[in-house]
């Protein structure tokens, strides 16, 4: 459960991401594909090369979903319901992949926002991404 301090940290950190959200989302996806090659199996129709328009496009979708989650941090299950349905019933993404992408997002944010990425912010973002992952996998049951 996110504490009030966690929510404040997440909103502040995501605010610093600003107009780079899509770029950071794509970079996190590239990190995931390179670090965890089995995740590529969900994207057989994508050009997964560096800078690919498809990876950039999906990175923007990831970032937009996270922006939505930040904006609805007190009601993520409702805000992310359609996305949860999509990943559980149509795409059938293995839930472990959300943890892998979350890790890659944390690395990407730490690389781009070193001054803001304090231990407290790191912990808050980790809890937030775990909460998002939990919501996205809630309909698998």
UniProtKB/Swiss-Prot annotation:
Phosphoserine found at: 3, 35, 49, 102, 124, 131, 138
Physiological role: Involved in oxygen transport from the lung to the various peripheral tissues.
Gene Ontology terms for molecular function: haptoglobin binding; heme binding; iron ion binding; organic acid binding; oxygen binding; oxygen carrier activity; peroxidase activity
Name of protein: Hemoglobin subunit alpha-1/2/3
InterPro entries the UniProt entry points to: Globin, Globin-like_sf, Globin/Proto, Hemoglobin_a-typ, Hemoglobin_oxygen_transport, Hemoglobin_pi
Superkingdom assignment: Eukaryota
Entry GO terms, CC: blood microparticle; haptoglobin-hemoglobin complex; hemoglobin complex
Assembly information from the UniProt record: Heterotetramer of two alpha chains and two beta chains.
Keyword annotations of the record: Acetylation, Heme, Iron, Metal-binding, Oxygen transport, Phosphoprotein, Transport
Organism: Macaca assamensis (Assam macaque)
Post-translational modification N6-acetyllysine, affected residues: 16
Positions carrying Phosphotyrosine: 24
